[in-house]
Swiss-Prot record:
Its main location: mitochondrion. This is Uncharacterized mitochondrial carrier C227.03c. One of its GO terms (cellular component) is mitochondrial inner membrane. PROSITE patterns: SOLCAR (PS50920). The keyword Calcium does not apply. It is found in: Mitochondrion inner membrane. Solcar repeats lie at residues 3-98, 131-276, 284-369. It comes from Schizosaccharomyces pombe (strain 972 / ATCC 24843) (Fission yeast). It is a multi-pass membrane protein.
Length: 371
């Protein structure tokens, strides 16, 4: 007899794996739009790649980097989604029991629609109604916190791989030894590029760097802006640890923990919508799962999307001046406006809605099959 926790782990891992493969190209576009200023080039903007809409961005990346560019970071993405969802669903189900959620509600596929749908909403005095919603929300938040804390290093590596642009020429050494002006890419169509003059103390450090086309600089300065180009997932892990230390793997953890509010909204709403639809139509259907996942994802993303922008910028390759989430929030507000907190949101919806549907549908199907 397979333990329920193991079933949840297997089903969650399968769900994460399926969703990562389906939406990898859209995730690359979304991450690059969010990272915006993390993209840089040297040599007077020769390598500047301006991204517009979702489809045009995919064409641009494909033209400049090939099919590999659209699937850049898919290795750590798969490596991240599999344990993330495995950990999440295991902790989620355990927490629901811990918080006293009725046995009828202890798993996604066993919800009693007569207690959760319209009838539960109308009977707001019912203690079971409050226990259900409170248990669901706290369980979702705790499971999210456990998942992001344990897997944050993987997402840092994934973000670094995705946000480093790979024109077919130019190496890391060339970029380190090149001109003294770094040109950040502005990913808005028709918007001019923004140039940033590097500080004097940094220029002095750059002039002392010795390099050759075949090796990395001797005693390079540390920090995400100076990290070498990464050849693959394991190379990224090694170089980040070597040049930046263990703490770099937890860059952006605070915004990620704030993002647990996302699942705190999404999961209770998903279970509510799914049960409501089953109750309304008098039968269970995979279509109800997809629709419930879509509606809950839209609601949760609209409320919590800014944290994803903050997390991506903190984790990105070239964000040396933003080591604090508070400072980054202030800087974005002052220099770019509040709209930048929702940069790439349209692309995010195109990516996350199918991903959410695939994740929940895969989980429900695999979990039912394991039973």
């Amino acid at each position: 007899m397979v333990d329920d926790s193991l079933k949840d782990a297997i089903a969650g891992g399968a769900a994460g794996l399926a969703s990562s493969l389906v939406v990898a190209p859209l995730d690359v576009v979304k991450t690059r739009k969010q990272a915006q200023k993390a993209f840089y080039s040297t040599g007077g903007g020769k390598n500047t790649m301006v991204l517009g809409g979702t489809l045009s961005s995919m064409r641009t990346i494909f033209h400049n980097e090939g099919i590999a560019g659209l699937y850049r970071g898919v290795g750590p993405m798969m490596l991240g989604y599999l344990p993330s969802w495995s950990i999440y669903f295991v902790v989620y189900e355990k927490c629901k029991v811990l918080f006293g959620v009725n046995k009828k509600y202890t798993s996604l596929h066993e919800i009693d629609s007569s207690k959760v749908g319209i009838k539960a909403s109308l009977d707001s005095s019912d203690k079971q109604f409050y226990r259900y919603w409170g248990g669901q929300i706290f369980s979702a938040v705790i499971a999210g916190a456990a998942s992001v804390t344990l897997t944050n290093p993987i997402w840092v590596v994934k973000t670094r791989l995705v946000t480093q642009s790979h024109p077919r020429a130019s190496s890391f050494v060339d970029k380190i030894a090149a001109a003294t002006t770094v040109q950040f890419r502005n990913l808005q169509t028709d918007a001019p590029s923004v140039k940033w003059r590097m500080p004097r103390f940094w220029l002095k450090r750059r002039t002392n760097v010795k390099s050759s086309p075949s090796q990395h600089p001797v005693n390079p300065p540390t920090g995400p802006a100076c990290s070498p180009a990464y050849n693959n997932t394991f190379d990224a892990f090694r170089k980040i640890y070597k040049y930046e230390g263990l703490a770099a793997f937890y860059r952006g953890l605070f915004p990620s923990l704030f993002g647990t509010l996302h699942v705190g909204i999404q999961f209770p709403l998903y279970e509510y919508f799914k049960s409501f639809l089953d109750d309304f139509f008098g039968k269970k259907s995979n279509f109800h799962i997809v629709l419930a996942a879509t509606l809950s994802k839209i609601a949760a993303s609209t409320v919590t999307y800014p944290h994803e922008v903050l997390r991506t910028r903190l984790q990105s390759l070239d964000a040396p001046t933003h080591n604090s989430a508070t400072l980054l929030i202030r800087d974005i507000w002052r220099s770019e406006g509040w709209r930048k907190y929702y940069s790439g949101m349209a692309t995010n919806f195109i990516r996350t809605i199918p991903a959410s549907s695939v994740t929940f549908l895969s989980f429900e199907i695999v979990r039912k099959w394991l039973n």
